[in-house]
């Protein structure tokens, strides 16, 4: 039986694993985790998964691997993986890496070893966003705003930036972090940091976007999209979308907008990748370009705030 694996089964990694076990009748599933308490709990929950502590215990051949570790150790584990196993496909969690050199190193190794890779900015896999993208295709101009209180803009903005590229059908042309506040704070994950303020830019027919995180605020996270003929307000957490246009007299109409959880998604994505070689996630090369547009100015931002040089301590 062929094998698939996940490296890192902490909070998010567990969600990946919950979906991967849908494939347990077709593949041997391996999970790499060093935390013995996590292994103990998950072994009881997933008795058919092979839990191991090191990458070197993985099979020599793997159809697909999810690397769901923190960003600061992801390159190291990638190197251990490719030095030990022949891997056909990899899904990386975001934020990919903290150092610019890691992006190029991994890209070169993927090309050298002919490994197909994607990055898990998962909104591209939501049916609701697929439908919305089709709806927005008829418009010439988009203006997008994402705003909320204390929603973790550092680690999560890459999701919204990827979504903007997806909805606009274009790469982000410029990205401005000049409106970020100079109050870097420790995140919930030890050794990583967060910040507040606004990230803005342009992406093709998206003439302007603003991504804002407000400190000391309980404002729910919302995404608003304005076109030349309509307005949309998306509440992902409560699974609805409001839309208004001239035809409705600019009155809001409510529609279902279903959020897809990671525990419902990973198995399906892996199956699509193995069977057809494609999925809706951004490929590594495209996501690398976007990550660097985001990471490089943040390295300077963190340096200006007294942090280690040439490092972006987000995950």
Regions found by a protein language model. Name each.
Residues 25-27, 85-89, 113-115:
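A short helix->loop->beta-strand "cap" motif at the edges of active sites that frequently abuts
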Residues 53, 92, 119-121, 177-179:
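Short loop/edge segments at beta-strand edges and connector loops
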Residues 144-220, 285:
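Rossmann-like dinucleotide-binding domain that binds NAD(P)(H)
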Residues 64-69, 271-315:
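C-terminal helix-rich "cap/oligomerization" subdomain common to oxidoreductases
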Residues 16, 46, 50-109:
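Beta-loop-alpha module in the N-terminal Rossmann-like domain of NAD(P)-dependent dehydrogenases
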Residues 205-268, 279-283:
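NAD(P)-dinucleotide binding in Rossmann-like oxidoreductases
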Residues 64-67, 72, 96-157, 161:
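A contiguous active-site-proximal alpha/beta segment in oxidoreductase catalytic domains
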Residues 1-46:
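N-terminal Rossmann-like dinucleotide-binding module
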């Amino acid at each position: 039986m062929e094998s698939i694996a996940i490296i890192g089964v902490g909070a998010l990694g567990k969600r990946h694993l919950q979906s991967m076990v849908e494939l347990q009748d077709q593949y041997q599933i391996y999970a790499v985790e060093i935390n013995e308490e996590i292994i103990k709990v998950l072994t009881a929950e997933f008795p058919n998964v092979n839990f191991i502590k090191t990458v070197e215990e993985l099979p020599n051949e793997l159809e697909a691997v999810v690397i769901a570790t923190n960003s600061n150790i992801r390159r190291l584990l990638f190197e251990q993986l490719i030095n030990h196993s022949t891997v056909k496909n990899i899904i990386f969690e975001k934020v990919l890496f903290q150092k610019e050199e890691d992006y190029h190193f991994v890209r070169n190794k993927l090309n050298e070893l002919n490994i197909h890779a994607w990055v898990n900015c998962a909104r591209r896999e939501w049916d609701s966003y697929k439908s919305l993208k089709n709806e927005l295709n008829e418009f010439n101009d988009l203006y997008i705003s994402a705003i909320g209180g204390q929603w973790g803009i550092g680690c999560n903005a890459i999701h919204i930036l990827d979504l903007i590229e997806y909805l606009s059908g274009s790469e982000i042309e410029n990205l401005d972090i000049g409106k970020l506040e100079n109050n870097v704070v420790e995140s919930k994950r030890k050794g990583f940091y967060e910040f507040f303020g606004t990230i803005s830019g342009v992406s093709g027919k998206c003439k302007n976007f603003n991504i804002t995180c407000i400190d000391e605020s309980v404002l729910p996270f919302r995404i608003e999209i304005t076109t030349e003929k309509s307005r949309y307000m998306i509440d992902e957490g409560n699974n609805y979308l409001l839309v208004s246009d001239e035809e409705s007299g600019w009155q809001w109409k409510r529609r279902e907008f279903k959020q897809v959880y990671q525990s419902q998604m990973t198995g399906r994505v892996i199956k699509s990748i193995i069977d057809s070689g494609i999925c809706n996630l951004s490929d590594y090369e495209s996501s690398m370009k976007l990550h660097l547009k985001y990471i490089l100015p943040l390295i300077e931002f963190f340096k200006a705030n007294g942090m280690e040089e040439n490092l972006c301590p987000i995950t």
